[in-house]
C-alpha cells in the first residue's frame, strides 16, 4: 500500500512538472571553447593563512605550501609568489612560507615575497602586478578548498590571468570532491 502511494505521488509530480514545461528537453547551449591557456611560465601564487600567536605556521598554511611546492615541480622555470602579511611575533605569513620553501630545497631566487596583504582581496591586488612584473604567462592559484571560490573571484577581479587553481582539501568532504574536480578541469576549461 505504501509503495503504491509513493508511486502515485511520484506520477502526479511528474505529470504536473511536464504540464508546466519543467521536463521539456533543455535547449542545448554550448559555451565557446576556452581560449588556449599558456602554461609556459605560470606564477604559482600561494595564499597565506593566519599564523599562530608565536609566529609559527598553522597546519593549513603548511599544507598550502606543500601543495604549491608540488605544483612548482611541474614548472621549473616558474616563480612562486608567497603572499600574506598579518605578522605574529615578528613573522609574516609570506616570510614563514619563504622559510619553509627554502628548508625544503626550493631556490630562493624563484621566490617572490609579498608580505603586506591582510586579506584575500589584498593578496590578489598585490600579487597580480608581481606576477606580471616577473614576466609570467598567468597564475596558478594555491589555497584551501573552503577558500578557493572567494580567492578565484578576488584574483579575477584584480585582473589576474587565472590559468588553474589547486587547493589542499579541508572542510566538508563534499566540497573537497567538487573542488578537486574543478581543480582537475581548470587547466582545460573555464570553470567558475
PLM region descriptions:
Residues 1-30:
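Secretory targeting and sorting signals
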Residues 2-5, 131, 190-192:
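Non-catalytic accessory segments flanking enzymatic or RNA/DNA-binding domains
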Residues 6-10, 68, 186:
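General helical structural elements
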Residues 30-183:
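A structural signal for short, hydrophobic/glycine-enriched beta-strand patches
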Residues 180-192:
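Glycine-rich flexible loop motifs, especially short His-Gly-Gly/GGXG/HXGH segments used as catalytic or interaction
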Amino acid at each position: 500500500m505504501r509503495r503504491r502511494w509513493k508511486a502515485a505521488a511520484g506520477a502526479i509530480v511528474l505529470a504536473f512538472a511536464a504540464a508546466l514545461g519543467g521536463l521539456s528537453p533543455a535547449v542545448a547551449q554550448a559555451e565557446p571553447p576556452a581560449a588556449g591557456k599558456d602554461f609556459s611560465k605560470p606564477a604559482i601564487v600561494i595564499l597565506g593563512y593566519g599564523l599562530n600567536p608565536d609566529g609559527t605556521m598553522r597546519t593549513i598554511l603548511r599544507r598550502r605550501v606543500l601543495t604549491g611546492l608540488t605544483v612548482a615541480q611541474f614548472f621549473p622555470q616558474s616563480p612562486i609568489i608567497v603572499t600574506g602579511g598579518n605578522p605574529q611575533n615578528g613573522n609574516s605569513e609570506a616570510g614563514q612560507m619563504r622559510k619553509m620553501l627554502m628548508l625544503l630545497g626550493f631556490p630562493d631566487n624563484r621566490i617572490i615575497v609579498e608580505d603586506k596583504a591582510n586579506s584575500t582581496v589584498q593578496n590578489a591586488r598585490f600579487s597580480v602586478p608581481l606576477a606580471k612584473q616577473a614576466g609570467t604567462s598567468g597564475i596558478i592559484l594555491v589555497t584551501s578548498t573552503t577558500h578557493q571560490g572567494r580567492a578565484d573571484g578576488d584574483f579575477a577581479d584584480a585582473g589576474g590571468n587565472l590559468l588553474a587553481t589547486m587547493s589542499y582539501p579541508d572542510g566538508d568532504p563534499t566540497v573537497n570532491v567538487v573542488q578537486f574536480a574543478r581543480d582537475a578541469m581548470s587547466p582545460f576549461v573555464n570553470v567558475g
